[in-house]
Regions:
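Contiguous, often N-terminal, cationic amphipathic patches that form binding interfaces
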Residues: 1-86
Length: 86
């Protein structure tokens, strides 16, 4: 699956900004059929970072959300600014 089709867009809320600052996590809308492994590979390829962990959930509306924990060497705030969140 194409990395640009896996990652749809980042989430922008107060809770998401707290996760970026405190836990070094990004929160993203992703393709419904994307696996955790595909999400990890897409983030690593598109943003040149090391991903520690990916947690996913499917919302009641039928969309998929991914919580991506970056390694300690990479800064989630830097990636968020590259995505245009800051």
């Amino acid at each position: 699956m194409d990395p640009y089709k896996i990652i749809k867009k980042p989430l922008i809320s107060e809770k998401d900004f707290e996760l970026i600052e405190k836990e070094n996590k990004l929160v993203l809308w992703v393709a419904l059929k994307a696996t955790k492994k595909q999400i990890k590979e897409a983030i690593e390829l598109l943003y040149n970072v090391k991903v520690d962990k990916v947690n996913t959930l499917i919302t009641p509306k039928g969309t998929k959300k991914a919580y991506v924990r970056l390694s300690d060497f990479d800064d989630a705030a830097d990636i968020a600014s590259r995505m245009g969140l800051f």
